[in-house]
Amino acid sequence: MKTIIVFLSFLVLVLATKFGDANEGVNREQTKEVIQNEFRGDFLNEMAAMSLLQQLEAIESALLEKEADRNSRQKRCNGKNVPCGSNHSPCCSGLSCEETFGYGWLYKSPYCVIPSNG
């Protein structure tokens, strides 16, 4: 009786080992396929996210550029009777940089004045 129990135990052990390895091989293949599919899916999702990120950055830079243009002030300019020339800021619109008799002879530089007609 003990011999039969030992023999059956041995038979069960051999069968379990044989079919266990077969299942383990199948499990390894399935695991490998799942991992490859997950990485492929993650890679594709990451590529789509990167593409979307690049599109958003392009839109953002265009909007920021428009806003910077809209909010930018006119550069500083000189008003009436203020020195102008190469070392000074330009005259404001409606004024021209001319040599005048009033201040120019003393300071040796042209001044922003209302343009003369003649």
UniProtKB/Swiss-Prot annotation:
Compartments reported by the entry: Secreted
Expressed in which tissues: Expressed by the venom gland.
Propeptide: 17-76
Primary localisation category: secreted
Keyword Lipid metabolism among UniProt keywords: no
Origin: domain of life: Eukaryota
Cysteine pairings via disulfide bonds: C77-C92, C84-C97, C91-C112
Alphabetized Pfam families for the sequence: Toxin_22 (PF08092)
Signal peptide: 1-16
A GO-annotated cellular component: extracellular region
Keywords of this entry: Disulfide bond, Ion channel impairing toxin, Knottin, Secreted, Signal, Toxin
GO molecular function, one term: toxin activity
Entry-linked InterPro entries: Toxin_22
Family (UniProt): Belongs to the neurotoxin 14 (magi-1) family. 06 (ICK-Trit) subfamily.
UniProt domain comment: The presence of a 'disulfide through disulfide knot' structurally defines this protein as a knottin.
Function of the molecule: Ion channel inhibitor.
Protein name stated in the entry: U16-barytoxin-Tl1c
